Structures are given as C-alpha cells and as structure tokens.
Amino acid sequence: MDPAIKPATRAFEDATPLLATPEELRREAARKGYLFFKHFFTREEIMELRTQILNVLQDENLLDPAKPFLDGFGNQPLIDTMTMEELNWNGIGTTQQVYHKVQKLQDFHAFAHHPKLLGLFDTLFGERTFPHPRNIARIMLPSDKLNVTPPHQDFLHIQGSSNTWTCWAPMGDVPVSLGSLSILEGSNDGGLLQVTSNPGAGGLETILCGLGYEWAEGDYEAGDIVIFHSMTVHKGLPNRQPGRIRLSLDLRFQPVSQPIENASLLPHGPFEWDELYEGWTREDLKYYWKKEQFEFLPFDESIRWQKDKIC
C-alpha cells in the first residue's frame, strides 16, 4: 500500500503534563516530531475568532442562512458555481477576495502572539521565540473540486531555520470526518525527503515509499492544537461532512537566534502589510520583526525538484 494513504495506527496523546518538565517535553518533541495539546486555548478564545472569520464568509454570502451561524455550513449552490481554480487558489480553500478580508483581521494575526503559545515555544526552544508574521488561515469550503493537502514537510516551503515549528489550530471542533490534520510520527528523523508533484496545497507531495513510519491522528476539539517540526511529514484528511466548512490556522515559530528566509516576513498572499494593517489598534503587531537582527538564508529551489513516485 502507498504509505501516503496508509490508515492511521497511532492516536494523539495529550502532551500538557510535559509542560511542567521542559527536558521531557523536548525529548518527546524530538522523538515524535510533534506534540498534541488538549484544550490549550479556551473554547471562548477559539469561538471569538471563528465568529470573525464566519462573518467574512457571511458578508460574501458563503454561509447557508438556514443553518446555525456557528455551525459553519456553506451556501452550497453558490460554492458549486466556483471554479476549481478559485477554490484551490493558494491552497487555502476559498477565493482570493475572501482570504484578503481574513488576512485583514487583527485578531487573526494576534493569535500567533498569544502569551501561552509563545511560552510553549520558549520552553521548547530554550530561548526567546520569534513568531513568523506570515500567518495562514485555511477556509476549506465544502466542494469536490477542492484538492486535499498531500503528505509534505513544511521546510520545503518555509526554509530558513530547520528548527521552525508549525502550530495547527482548528477554529472549532474538527473531527477526522471534517478533514483534520494527520501526522507521520517520527518522520522528522528522516531528514529532507524527495518530492513529486501533487495538485493539493503547496503543489508538492513528499515521497514516502519504503519508510516505516506510522500515521497519528484524532478528533480535535475547539482549543486543541498540534505543533510539529518543519521536517515532520503531515497531511490533510478529506472532508466527509457534506456542507460543512473547515476552519484552521497555520502559525509558525522559530528560535529568534536562528536564520530565516525573507518570504517568512511577507504576507501570505499577494497583499501588502500597510494595506492589511488599516484599522488596526495594536501597534505591537505591526512590523515587529524589524527590531530583530536576523541572518537571512536564500530560498533553495533545488530541494523542491520533483522526482517520479514509484512505490
């Protein structure tokens, strides 16, 4: 069987107790390549941002008015008129117009600066954490035209420091059936793997042929998060709940002393910071990286060269 579609054999285990023992937390993070935390954020914090994102969708007539607002059901007749190109633009599951409005939300970007989240990564890194400003929202509209995110390593797209970690935070309850995130446990140990082309988000699929790692997954509740190393292979699961929209955030963090690639300081999408910042009240969220002294590493396109997938 192709390892990319092999069923999961591992279940997520709550790493919250490890926060009291930093050395154990670091050992477990290195061994598994990821850590899962139950109820890391309060449900109220998640639902507040979920509401703001759903308001954007409602303004664009993308919610089903006959269903409860917070349930996040899509306006299926309108979604069905969208092209494959619109739905798969930039791998975020919705149109550029919708995404632009989400990127303008101050509270969306503020999530990466949550004191509890920065404290977690300070503990993991053993030094001050730098939160990347290039925050990503996934607004996965329900459509058969939407490509599922293939197995991949984030380092292919981020580069800079390999000790960059992603926090995947669902904006609401996201069970496996709604298209949650699956992690290939221990795959951070395998180094940078070869890739082939794939139509899903990022355009690249990591080739897993001959590797013996096992998939871990589970149902996420609002407030749960999973964090994982840039070399850890992960993938999206298909949305099998008709009509439901899946909302999640990708937030990235690294030790402040480590090098970075310049694109990590740009907006996610063809936007400009000055325009996104219009109407913001928190000056501390604007251009905060300019006070840092980074070593910049050039983007290496050669690691993205594609091979044939032969399993």
Q: What is each residue range found by the language model?
A:
Residues 158-176, 219-222, 227, 252-256:
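Short, conserved beta-strand element in jelly-roll/cupin
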Residues 41-43, 137-139, 156, 174-176, ...:
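Short, solvent-exposed loop/turn segments at secondary-structure junctions
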Residues 2-31, 38-151, 157:
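Non-heme Fe(II)-dependent double-stranded beta-helix
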Residues 127-130, 153-160, 171-180, 186-188:
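Active-site region of the double-stranded beta-helix
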Residues 3, 10, 15, 27, ...:
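Double-stranded beta-helix
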Residues 77-82, 151-152, 200-212, 263-269:
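Short, surface-exposed loop/helix-turn segments at secondary-structure junctions
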Residues 2-15, 59, 63, 87, ...:
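Non-heme Fe(II)/2-oxoglutarate
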Residues 154-156, 164, 235-240:
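Glycine-rich phosphate/pyrophosphate-binding beta-alpha loops
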